[in-house]
Amino acid sequence: MGKKENQLYEGAYVFSVTLSEEARRKALDKVISGITNYGGEIHKIHDQGRKKLAYTIRGAREGYYYFIYFSVSPGAITELWKEYHLNEDLLRFMTLRADSVKEVLEFASLPE
């Protein structure tokens, strides 16, 4: 992998609610260590807690949401996605380029 300048990303991660608190922490640590192992830097982690999913994913109606702002080389993103696909505790993930790190996140609740 060539040395390219790191870019800022926002990663959204939804973990299974069947995980214990310790298992969820280990699953989150796995995501974080994946980023740092590729030379990335974590800027901010937002723990959004347990929330209702917009639709059922693998039988789950709820998930634990985390948003992580990090910088890493663009070439590392593909490798991270490969790792995410192998992580059975991770229901969904999305990675977007970010312009800045948001200090506060606010979301509207889903209708009942």
Swiss-Prot record:
Keywords: Ribonucleoprotein, Ribosomal protein, RNA-binding, rRNA-binding. GO terms for molecular function: small ribosomal subunit rRNA binding; structural constituent of ribosome. SUPFAM superfamilies: Ribosomal protein S6 (SSF54995). One of its GO terms (cellular component) is ribosome. InterPro entries: Ribosomal_bS6, Ribosomal_bS6_sf, Ribosomal_S6_plastid/chlpt, Transl_elong_EF1B/ribsomal_bS6. Pfam families: Ribosomal_S6 (PF01250). GO terms for biological process: translation. It comes from the Bacteria. Binds together with bS18 to 16S ribosomal RNA. HAMAP family: Ribosomal_bS6. Belongs to the bacterial ribosomal protein bS6 family. This is Small ribosomal subunit protein bS6. The lineage of its organism: Bacteria, Pseudomonadati, Chlamydiota, Chlamydiia, Chlamydiales. The gene is rpsF.
